[in-house]
A protein has these predicted regions:
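Conserved glycine-rich cofactor-binding loop
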Residues: 20-21
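Short, small/polar-rich loop/turn modules that mediate ligand/substrate recognition or access, typified
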Residues: 89, 176, 181, 242-244
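Conserved NAD(P)H cofactor-binding loop of Rossmann-fold oxidoreductase domains
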Residues: 91-96, 252
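Substrate-binding pocket helix/loop in short-chain dehydrogenase/reductase
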Residues: 99-100, 107-112, 212
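C-terminal substrate-recognition "lid" of short-chain dehydrogenase/reductases
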Residues: 120, 129, 220-249, 254
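Catalytic loop of short-chain dehydrogenase/reductase
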Residues: 136-163, 168-177, 189
Length: 256
């Protein structure tokens, strides 16, 4: 269910990467409900179309963020479709859990290129357009729980998310002369459907979520809409004094 917004995003344009499922889908829909026009980017046309279905002003672009031409393609697609770019949401991520001794070069490269290098290069490509709009970069997944605690099998994923957190803080300083600000949202355990996509059984998913809920003061795992609500508000012009901030949305899991 998409939470109702109040329309203060009217006229703005946003790009959301990883917009085909989970938090990315919820964010694209929430931005559209807030009045923004949105370009959702992902690798699978069918999931992107499901995100856009029933939401006027949402367009889709199939792109692999690790392709050399992806940053320019995405930026050009947004400008060609809407004429401006106000909000860039970095949401796409790859997680490949495996013991450190089993990490392959291919898996390491894929996580680093998708989770870290892609936001760097896309932000660089979009910077002139963002500067023209005095826009905002929002990084989702910055130093989430996996980036603050040690979890076996999650070393590379956690490292990329911690690095993204540092990028947000550095961008706040470096992009300020351009009139562009950077903020982050750090979700805790969120029911994004990733378990199903990774082939987990229903019993394994239920057990994992029950364990996560038990570790969380709020007593449940998050919903994608819990996270997208914060993305929308941080991206609004009214939130412009938030710069370099990373908001943790984890039900209190990181404080226990």
């Amino acid at each position: 269910m998409t939470r109702r917004q109040d329309g203060t995003g009217q006229g703005r344009v946003a790009v959301v990467t990883g917009g085909g499922t989970g938090i990315g889908r919820a964010t694209a829909r929430a931005l559209a409900a807030d009045g923004a026009r949105v370009l959702v980017v992902g690798r699978t046309a069918a999931t992107l179309e499901r995100t856009a279905a029933g939401h006027q002003g949402v367009r889709t672009l199939v792109a692999d963020l690790t392709d050399d031409d992806a940053p320019e393609r995405i930026t050009s697609a947004a400008l060609d479709a809407f004429g401006r770019l106000d909000v860039l949401v970095h949401n796409a991520a790859v997680v490949l859990p495996e013991p450190f001794g089993a990490v392959t070069r291919e898996h390491a490269r894929l996580q680093v290129e998708t989770n870290l290098l892609a936001p760097v290069l896309l932000t660089r490509a979009a910077l002139p357009a963002l500067a023209a709009a005095r826009g905002t970069v929002v990084a989702v997944g910055t130093a989430a729980v996996q980036g603050r605690r040690a979890f076996a099998g999650m070393s590379l994923y956690g490292a990329t998310k911690t690095a993204l957190d540092f990028l947000v803080r550095t961008w706040a300083v470096e992009l300020a002369p351009w009139g562009v600000r950077a903020v982050g949202v750090a979700p805790g355990e969120t029911d994004t459907g990733i378990g199903e996509r990774m082939g987990w059984s229903a019993a394994d998913i239920a057990r994992h979520q029950a364990e996560a809920a038990a570790r969380t003061p709020s007593g449940r795992v998050g919903r994608p809409e819990d996270v997208s609500w914060w993305v929308v508000r941080l991206a609004r012009p009214e939130g412009a004094y938030a710069n370099g901030a990373v908001v943790t949305v984890d039900g209190g899991a990181s404080v226990v």
